Design a protein with these regions (language model features):
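Membrane-embedded alpha-helical signal segments
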Residues: 1-306, 324
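Transmembrane alpha-helical segments that form the functional core of multipass membrane systems
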Residues: 272-365
């Protein structure tokens, strides 16, 4: 099971546990018993009580989410050598939590943080001990090219942002992060170049993401559909790519990028109809070669749209347009078909679509 899938299941367990006990109001002191009450029936929760320098310390963490080596070297070992010093000075990566926000504390716990209660000091700390497991950066299978970079996005938001930072080393690249999904608490990032992107469009995208109310997002296409202007339009209003070089080129054109943690794709907005005829390799070819390839794609579009209808129209209503020899052959072949041409064509199109869908969905191994 992927860490994100496991984490979603844990959030659901915590949501069930919250129904058994109310969260404390902001400013109220949080106790270890509250953590145990909220994390009721979560078997992978580890709860330890340590005595460090004659002081009792309660420790909470989730086994599958925490790297035990990091926990020992960055938390337990420094505390054992602290000699009664302030834990904030001993643990440089620790963050205090003194506002009584239990929901935030539970969210950090479910993200792989370790929670420490220093009861005598009335101090609560959380340390990021998350065990980072991610897929290696590989070639893009959906947008394979011969020329240009061969890397693609993965399911980790931080890695995807680093791939873009390596290409756009400018302070004008702005990254605004949000947390969406009432149950999944997905992290989503909005990227744009401040000196190029349209400010009105940027604010519009930010506002829509902030106003999204949904239980959880399992992928970027779900979020994409909730941000569209015209959800019933057959044409995509967001571009979707898994290549960092495509995203960098879109940012330089003034586009806005949306990246969701857990998704190996990035959404580009706004999108235009003509972009559907572009290939990632067009940027690395000469303009004449790229233009010729785009013209071929346009020609293929018109052939796809008009060929079937032209066949039915000529064969049914305008047979005089065909040469006599070809008309004779078609008439002989049609005499064995019990359906009119329009039914025949629809049946053939349906069979081809079924075969194509089966070829895509069938397991390859």
């Amino acid at each position: 099971m992927e860490p994100t899938d496991w984490w979603r299941a844990q959030v659901f367990k915590v949501a069930q546990a919250k129904s058994r006990g109310a969260s404390p109001s902001r400013g109220e002191r949080i106790t270890p018993e509250m953590i145990k009450q909220q994390m009721y029936n979560v078997d992978d929760l580890s709860s330890l009580v340590l005595t460090i320098n004659d002081e009792e310390v309660h420790v909470f963490f989730l086994d599958p989410m925490v790297e035990l080596t990091k926990l020992y070297e960055n938390v337990f070992l420094p505390l054992q050598r602290s000699d009664g010093k302030d834990p904030l000075n001993v643990l440089p990566y620790a963050q205090p939590c003194r506002e009584g926000n239990l929901d935030l504390l539970l969210s950090n716990l479910l993200r792989g943080h370790t929670i420490l209660f220093f009861l005598e000091r009335e101090l609560i700390l959380h340390v990021n001990t998350f065990q980072v497991e991610h897929r290696a950066i590989t070639k893009s299978e959906s947008e394979a090219t011969v020329l240009g970079p061969q890397d693609s996005f993965v399911e980790m938001l931080e890695i995807n942002l680093s791939l873009l930072r390596r290409r756009l080393t400018t302070p004008n690249l702005k990254i605004v992060a949000y947390t969406i999904g009432t149950e999944t608490q997905n992290r989503v990032a909005v990227l744009y170049l401040e000196n190029i992107a349209n400010e009105i469009n940027v604010e519009r995208v930010k506002t829509r993401i902030q106003n999204v109310e949904y239980q959880g997002f399992v992928g970027l296409p779900v979020l994409k559909q909730m941000l569209e202007d015209k959800p019933y339009s057959p044409f995509p209003q967001f571009g979707l790519t898994s290549r960092p070089d495509n995203v960098a080129a879109a940012l330089l054109d003034g586009r806005i990028i949306i990246i969701l943690n857990g998704s190996p794709d990035a959404a580009i907005c706004p999108a235009s109809f003509l972009e559907m005829f572009s290939s990632p390799e067009d940027f690395y070819n000469r303009w004449s070669t790229a233009s010729l390839l785009r013209m071929i794609r346009f020609f293929g579009l018109f052939v796809t749209i008009l060929l079937t209808s032209s066949y039915v129209s000529v064969l049914t209503f305008h047979p005089e347009m065909l040469p006599p020899a070809l008309l004779t052959i078609l008439s002989e072949s049609r005499s064995q078909v019990p359906f009119p041409p329009v039914i025949e064509v629809i049946f053939i199109e349906l069979v081809i679509e079924i075969l194509r869908e089966a070829g895509i969905r069938m397991p390859t191994k």
